[in-house]
Design a protein with these regions (language model features):
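Flexible nucleotide-interacting loop at or near the entrance of a catalytic core
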Residues: 96-106, 224-330
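ABC ATP-binding cassette signature C-motif
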Residues: 1-227, 311-543
Length: 543
């Protein structure tokens, strides 16, 4: 069936988000929705779902509210009667017959079979969702969407936290799917591989384009260049118009001054010329003032960071011969990791391999079962949290930015405006912001708190593409060091760093060349480091 959604205006909490929404979707179309953070993409998905609830399934991006629920139970909740009987069977075996009658075991088997396509084990499905990695949580949400088997599937940020292998599997699934798919994503590569159409959302309208993201971008770029040429032409016309106005005013002044001549015929002619010149000048001035042609905007925002205390240590941190087990599952075994002064870090690896766990060790939230952690005592770490747990939802964006050291009101407003926060949003509760806006605010707080080391865990998940480009500019101009965990291939290609990969319970430095020749100076520095080894073979604590 076809799906239509028309609303004028499109509002949320009494506030107009989009002046005019007009969306038509044909059966089997795979549509990616693009637009700035806070424009209403998630709200639009919710409203479409409400209209077509009997024929649609909505995969939500935030799994926090389900953290205490067993993953299998979350999926089985699609069949509430089955789930109720399944739980009752733990205490009353007589309900087994009812469970069989409802095809409960067949549903479970179907879930387990589909789970294999998402690299989810039965053990994973029997865990509370909160104990799963961000990528595994996304897989569970996607699995539930697939099991629902609705005609229209709405996906909110389906690529978040997914490793490259799972992303490739998702691309394959979507390209084979006969379902009608509408999804919000900021992943350019994913849109290029899966989208048959793009819907662009602005505060004024929605527009539908045939093709993937690159094809959409070509059209938008062409439109922008056309607008630039039209603006330049208009500016030239305005300049010529102003020159004409100046000449006409000069004629009027000259004619008026000359009306005192004695020849009555010449006096009449000059008086008439003065009057006409005055009228013409007024008309031309009105034409200039009535012309409203705004200069096309380009995304070219730049930021400068305050100087930081210089750290003199050769190694900011070092974790030696460490092992770690979580829920009886070994994550690391005799692994090694270090961050050298002046070195940026890119960390990759499959979902559930231990990337977030390593961050928790670096942030001293966890201690390895075995091994020793050396961190420069004066090291100031800034951490970007996937769940925005660092935000006070009752506060306003402006107040939180003003709490930063050395921040004044004018500077805070300028920074927030550069990140797309208007005067209304900066003075209202953070709880009312979209997920993307909350992430943007967290970035502002993180970058302008001047840490020595920025740890960014999946920084592009909730950002529109313009903000992603801005973030990369900020990272490249940052005075300190940056540690990024990302599955985004585009960001990986743009970020110059030492590349570490989590694989087979080890951390591998992919930037090391196996055929590297011996460097005498490097070797001497290493020997100096080894002088600090104690009798147990561990590095002594840095002072």
């Amino acid at each position: 069936m076809s799906f239509y959604f028309v609303q004028k205006p499109f509002e949320k909490y009494g506030k107009t988000l989009i002046e005019h929404v007009n969306i038509s979707v044909e059966p089997g179309e795979h549509i990616a929705i693009v637009g700035d953070n806070g424009v209403g993409k998630t709200s639009l998905l919710n409203e479409i779902f409400k209209k077509y609830e009997d024929n649609a399934y909505l995969m939500k991006q935030d799994m926090t509210v389900y953290h205490d629920i067993i993953a299998m139970d979350y999926i089985m909740s699609l069949y509430p009667e089955c789930l109720t009987i399944k739980k009752a069977m733990q205490y009353n075996y007589e309900r087994i017959a009812d469970y069989i009658a409802l095809n409960g075991y067949e549903i479970e088997q179907r879930i387990l079979t589909k789970a294999k396509q998402f690299n989810l084990t039965e053990h994973d499905l029997n865990q509370p969702i909160g104990l799963l990695s961000g990528g595994q949580q996304t897989k569970v949400a996607l699995l539930r969407a697939v099991i629902s088997d609705k005609e229209l599937i709405l996906l909110d940020e389906p690529t978040n936290h997914l490793d490259q292998a799972m992303l490739a599997d998702l691309v394959q699934y979507m390209n084979k799917s006969n379902h009608t798919l509408i999804y919000v994503t900021h992943h350019r590569g994913f849109m290029n591989e899966t989208a048959s159409h793009i819907i662009e959302i602005t505060n004024q309208y929605t527009r539908k384009f045939i093709g993937n993201y690159n094809q959409y971008k070509e059209i938008i770029d062409l439109e922008f260049q056309t607008q630039v040429r039209a603006y330049e032409k208009h500016q030239k016309e305005i300049k010529e118009l102003e020159q004409t106005i100046s000449r006409v005013k000069e004629w009027h002044y000259t004619a008026k001054q000359s009306t005192s001549v004695r020849d009555p015929i010449e006096q009449k002619r000059l008086s008439k010329l003065a009057q006409k010149s005055k009228i013409k000048a007024t008309q031309l001035t009105q034409k200039r003032n009535d012309t409203n042609f705004e200069e096309p905007e380009m995304d070219d925002r730049h930021f400068h960071f305050n100087d930081q205390d210089v750290l003199r240590k050769r190694n900011l941190l070092r974790i030696e011969h460490f092992s770690m087990t979580m829920n009886n599952n070994p994550i690391y075994e005799n692994a090694h990791f270090e961050i050298k002064n002046g070195e940026n870090i890119l960390l990759t690896g499959p979902n559930g391999s231990g990337k977030s766990l390593l961050i928790d060790i670096i942030r001293q939230r966890l201690i390895p079962d075995i091994g020793k952690v050396h961190i420069t005592p004066s090291l100031k770490i800034g951490y970007f949290d996937q769940q925005n747990n660092n935000l006070d939802y009752d506060e306003t964006p402006l107040n939180m930015v003003l709490d930063l050291e050395g921040m004044n009101r004018s500077h805070a407003q300028t920074i927030l405006a550069s990140f797309g926060f208007n005067q209304y949003k900066i003075v209202h509760a953070i709880a009312d912001l979209s997920m993307g806006e909350k992430s943007r605010l967290q970035f502002v707080l993180l970058f302008f708190s001047n840490p020595h080391l920025l740890i960014l865990d999946e920084p592009t998940n909730y950002f529109d593409i313009a903000t992603q480009n801005l973030i990369m500019k900020m990272v490249q101009s940052f005075n300190g060091q940056v540690f990024i965990v990302t599955h985004d291939v585009y960001m990986q290609s743009q970020f110059k760093a030492t590349h570490w990969e989590v694989r087979n319970k080890q951390l591998h430095n992919l930037s090391l060349k196996q055929d590297k020749k011996l460097n005498v100076n490097d070797t001497l520095r290493l020997l100096d480091d080894y002088k600090a080894i104690d009798e147990n073979g561990h590095f002594e604590t840095d002072n």
